[in-house]
């Protein structure tokens, strides 16, 4: 079992964007916190659950596409993956590693709101996504 977390704090200077009328503020901040837990059975089959929360400074021009003018988004991510080749038994050589998986992201808030975030009735859950992936390392 593995438990990971991360916090990212980002500051942007937007002097040029503000001069061009693309941002209201000359600087904004963006913060992101993520925590996830993973379990791998025999290093072959894995399940990961992640909670994420992103928030930042409002700006009426930079985030003009949503009614809250905020970048705030939060939700859960679920991932199920398998590693058929990762322990030296690959037909393509001992160093070939392959992981296949599926990932689902469930948004609670998107662009500052759970419902009608864009003023057109869109819900945060309209951005939920499913991703199928293959990861290869050699």
Predicted regions, residues:
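Outer-membrane beta-barrel pore domains
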Residues: 1-138
């Amino acid at each position: 079992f593995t438990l990971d977390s991360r916090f990212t704090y980002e500051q942007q200077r937007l002097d040029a964007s503000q001069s061009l009328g693309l941002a209201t503020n000359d600087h904004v901040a963006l913060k992101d916190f993520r925590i996830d837990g993973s379990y791998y059975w025999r290093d072959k089959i894995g399940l990961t659950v992640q909670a994420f929360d992103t928030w930042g400074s409002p700006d009426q021009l930079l985030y003009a596409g949503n009614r809250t003018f905020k970048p705030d988004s939060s939700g859960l991510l679920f991932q199920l993956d398998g590693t058929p080749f990762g322990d030296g038994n690959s037909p393509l050589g001992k160093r070939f590693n392959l992981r296949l998986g599926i990932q689902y992201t469930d948004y609670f808030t998107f662009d500052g709101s759970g419902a009608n975030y864009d003023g057109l009735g869109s819900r945060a859950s309209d951005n939920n996504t499913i991703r199928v992936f293959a990861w290869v390392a050699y």
